[in-house]
A protein has these predicted regions:
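Short, acidic, small-residue-rich periplasmic hinge/interaction motif at the N-terminus
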Residues: 33, 73-75, 87-131, 138, ...
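N-terminal periplasmic "start-of-domain" segments of outer-membrane beta-barrel proteins
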Residues: 48, 103-135, 158-159, 188-198, ...
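Short acidic/polar hinge/loop motifs at secondary-structure boundaries
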Residues: 61, 182-220
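N-terminal periplasmic accessory domains that precede
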Residues: 91-94, 137-140, 144, 163-166, ...
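Extracytoplasmic beta-strand/coil segments of soluble accessory domains associated
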Residues: 141-188
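Transmembrane beta-barrel wall of Gram-negative outer-membrane proteins
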Residues: 248, 258-377, 381-401, 816
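Gram-negative outer-membrane beta-barrel transporters
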Residues: 471, 652, 656-794, 867-871
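C-terminal beta-signal and adjacent terminal beta-strands/loops
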Residues: 729, 784-793, 814-872
Length: 872
């Protein structure tokens, strides 16, 4: 049977199934322990959900009359669940208690709903995570939060496998990521090539399985005064599932309608009682196959005079998503130590193993990088990383002598092993007797150890409400290491290239790390913080936060924050914040070194050509010869102001303006390969160099709009609508800080490519719309995303290109029947692609690369899928 007919029949069956189901209704009320109503609670049974109204009431319309498990959950409170027997309509009430085993929402150390905060916090609940067409955590966030960007770079070395994520158009390392409120370690990878976030090391969000996540909190405000380094753009906190829940098995399969990009994702998860507590465990396996949108290479492939040297254009490149196979395990334990549940031991952590594979630039048979006796038609070298990520955090929280305490210790580690296949080391000669095609190119390692003690207590001091006092101390130790690859991955074998000239040394596509690159270093920091927050007047809440931190490598830093929340009416809240922040230079930026093949614009031809360029730490002799100095922390000033308007219990609008000034931003320099710098670097035996430096000041400003509306349609079910818009613009507001040794070379230190990467390389505005209809067990969800325009990373104005904004649509139809959930859907329903690269420009590479690799929505086209889940 043809594939389109099978898909059509599957959809038809899912549409007909609800007609045979006998619906039942579950109603009830959710209250606090004192009997007062609790609005905003998510009550769910399978994929059917409702949110309690101002009187705490809810109603669920279920597809059949069988037994069903109903769950009531609200951040900051203990989740409650009950089994409701079938046989007709039923009533189920819940009483929720403040949770001592659950993290407090980011942005404040006082419990409260996100709308009550003085800073904007987005909450992505479990039902939105579960219904997303994506399975990767970072893509799920991008589908919902317009301030979040997750492009799909290609031919960027390891960045193809661990892709950068940004918030508000800033860098990946200016976003703090936490799990259950605890700092997450960064990836060992440095984004060293032509991608968004070049020169940074962010957190690998996709190492955390989405099936383990209860909710995702996004703080859109600077928070260094509360959480320390990196929280300049904001904070993402992943809250793990923690309750006893039935075992669930899920499987998803899909592919693009262009015949590639197959995804197979399976997960098993469940929560199990353990004494008075519970442990939730998740296992997930995902195969994501590559996509390829490269077009034919029109150039000669074989040396002149050889047979068929340009008979037809050759489709021999790879341009698209890389292959990735992920195996992930995660668990979260909460174990009360006392009968009243006020002393809790907790532990959470996980393991992930990713095998990636992606191509570099194709080496034609006639290029000096090839030995035609080994690859007579040329070759596409592959980088095949192995990325292993482990983490474990354990601690205790509860009440002690009227204080709430939280003591924890955590360890996280990321190892990034580089393997190169289908390649060669040109300098090892033209035969496999002296050469080889597979290399181990070395390992990058990053690790983080933290110890925290947090204390908080409410005091009555004569204000309109209690004063929440929170304080704490933190010790953090970071480590970074580079391990050399096998000798043949980097050494110069002395053989000439096919033209008799000196051959480039090292494995093609990624020369291995050399013994001279090896490093094993660490630093530590100690911090103390204090938070005060309370109702100064009946309608005015003020918060103050301060943090002092001492780093072993660059000294002290202090930061503060003030927040104000004013509510003249129950339906209206004005809020604002002012803070200072910082980002400590990462050890990766201070100590990373490597020699790699970079395809840069050749001044003679105007096209991309290979250059062997070395990256050197700022402490090295060659970097100091170019004027490099020790890296300083980035510092920031953040202002925000906004409002929350809730005219109806089921309708809410928020609007927030922000301004972020950053001084001494750390950037990756341009490639010093020209004749002006050769006298400086030739004594060191190299022909190209680059390094990290504090070079620019920037200003980022913009605004965010969010609206949510829920509509009960009586017997027709429930309708949910949401809209979110983000606008941001980043400008460089200073001259490039150029050392005297490079006088007159500021356009090389921070060239036009890097300027465009910072100022227009990411969309300046994004819009997300979502509509969801639920009746009984049937749920239909549509999403529309508008991605704003972005620019090419180009050196010459003649090559500049602006890629137009684009609308993409997703659709999913899901049906709950007894213990099964069946879903079919399409991502990028109308098969939208970004604008094509203009022919004749470096980004088009002779027409081989049709689409920009920095596209925020990739270049895969329509993706269709089906998903089935079973709950025991």
């Amino acid at each position: 049977m043809p594939k389109p007919r099978r898909v059509f029949l599957t959809i038809l069956i899912l549409l007909v199934l609800p007609l045979a189901a006998q619906a039942m209704t579950v109603r009830g009320r959710v209250t606090l322990s004192d009997g007062s109503p609790l609005p905003g609670v998510t009550v769910s049974a399978g994929s059917v959900t409702a949110v309690t109204d101002p009187d705490g009431r809810y109603e669920l319309v279920l597809p059949d009359g069988g037994s069903v498990r109903v769950t009531a959950a609200l951040q900051g409170f203990q989740t409650r669940a009950a089994t409701v027997d079938g046989g007709g309509d039923a009533t189920q009430d819940f009483t929720l208690h403040v949770s001592y085993g659950q993290e407090i929402t980011v942005g404040s150390r006082a419990i409260g709903a996100e709308a009550e905060k003085a800073v904007p916090v987005d909450i992505i609940p479990e039902e939105q995570i579960r219904s997303s067409p994506s399975t990767e955590t970072a893509q799920i966030i991008q589908k919902i939060a317009p301030s979040f960007n997750f492009p799909r770079p290609t031919i960027t070395d390891g960045t193809d496998t661990v892709r950068p994520a940004t918030l508000r158009g800033l860098g990946p390392d200016q976003l703090l990521v936490m799990v259950n409120g605890k700092r997450r370690h960064a990836s060992a990878l440095v984004n060293a090539n032509n991608s968004v976030g070049r020169g940074s090391s962010g957190v690998d969000l996709n190492a955390i399985p989405a099936s383990a996540i209860q909710s995702i909190e996004i703080l859109r405000d600077g928070a260094s005064a509360q959480y320390g380094s990196d929280a300049i753009a904001g904070v993402i906190n992943l809250v793990l599932k923690s309750d006893a829940e039935p075992l669930s098995v899920s499987a998803k399969a899909g592919m693009t309608t262009h015949g590639d990009g197959q995804v197979i994702d399976t997960s098993v998860s469940g929560g199990f009682r353990l004494g008075r507590g519970a442990i939730f465990a998740t296992g997930e396996y995902r195969d994501r196959y590559e996509t390829n949108r490269a077009e034919a290479d029109p150039r000669d492939q074989i040396r002149a005079g050889d047979a068929g040297n340009n008979a037809v254009a050759q489709p021999n490149h790879h341009w698209g998503d890389s292959y990735a196979r992920d195996v992930m395990l995660f668990s979260n334990l909460n174990l009360p130590l006392t009968e009243d549940g006020k002393q809790v031991f907790y532990a959470f952590g996980g393991y992930s193993n990713r095998h990636g594979s992606h191509g570099g630039f194709f080496r034609r048979a006639l290029q000096a990088q090839n030995q035609p006796q080994i690859y007579p038609l040329g070759f596409l070298p592959l980088i095949e990383p192995r990325v292993v990520d482990t983490s474990l955090t354990a601690g205790a929280r509860g009440e002690l002598a009227t204080w709430f305490y939280d003591f924890s210790a955590g360890y996280g580690k990321n190892d990034f092993d580089f393997y190169v296949t289908d390649s060669l080391n040109t300098s090892l000669g033209p035969t496999l007797q002296t050469n080889q095609t597979r290399f181990y190119a070395g390992t990058l390692g990053d690790k983080l150890f933290t110890v925290n003690l947090d204390l908080s207590k409410e005091y009555k001091v004569g204000l309109a409400g209690p004063l929440n006092v929170a304080g704490g101390v933190e010790y953090r130790r970071e480590g970074y290491a580079i391990e050399a690859g096998e000798p043949n991955s980097y050494r110069d074998g002395g053989f000439p290239d096919q033209f008799g000239n000196r051959a480039p040394a090292g494995a093609q596509v990624f020369p291995g790390f050399r013994p001279s690159n090896e490093v094993d270093t660490s630093r530590n920091s100690k911090a103390v913080y204090l938070d005060l927050e309370g109702d100064v007047l009946a309608k005015l809440r003020v918060g103050l936060a301060g943090r002092l931190e001492d780093f072993s490598d660059f000294g002290n830093t202090s930061n503060g924050k003030i927040t104000v929340r004013y509510s003249p009416l129950r339906q209206l809240i004005f809020r604002g914040a002012a803070s200072t922040g910082f980002r400590a230079p990462s050890l990766n930026q201070s100590y990373f070194s490597a020699v790699s093949t970079n395809f840069l614009r050749d001044p003679a031809t105007g096209q991309l050509a290979p250059f062997e360029v070395g990256t050197y730490p700022v402490s090295s002799d060659i970097a100091r010869a170019l004027g490099a100095t020790a890296l300083r922390p980035e510092t920031s000033r953040n202002l925000s102001a906004g409002l929350v308007f809730q005219p109806l219990a089921n309708f809410e609008v928020t609007a927030d303006y922000f301004n972020i000034d950053i001084e001494d931003r750390i950037v990756f320099s341009g490639n010093f390969t020209g004749p002006q710098v050769l006298p400086l670097i030739q004594p060191f035996g190299v022909t190209g160099a680059r390094f990290f430096t504090n070079a620019i000041d920037t200003e980022t400003k913009g605004y965010d709009l969010v609206a949510n509306y829920q509509l009960g349609a009586g017997g027709w079910g429930r309708l949910d609508f949401s809209a979110a818009y983000s606008n941001n613009e980043t400008k460089i507001v200073s001259e490039v800080a150029t050392p005297p040794q490079l006088a007159g070379l500021s356009e090389v230190l921070f060239d036009r490519i890097e300027r465009r990467r910072v100022e227009c390389g990411q969309p300046k505005d994004n819009l997300r719309l979502m509509q969801s209809w639920n009746r009984g067990g049937l749920t239909a969800t549509t999403r529309e995303s508008r991605y704003g325009e972005f620019c090419s990373f180009t050196l010459l104005p003649i090559d500049d290109q602006i890629y137009d904004a684009a609308w993409l649509a997703d659709f999913e139809l899901a049906y709950d029947w007894r213990n099964y959930t069946l879903s079919v859907g399409a991502e990028n329903l109308f098969d939208r692609f970004p604008d094509r690269n203009r022919l004749g420009t470096p980004q088009a590479n002779f027409g081989i690369f049709p689409y920009p690799s920095q596209s925020p929505y990739g270049m895969n086209g329509r993706f269709v899928y089906t998903r089935v889940a079973y709950t025991f």
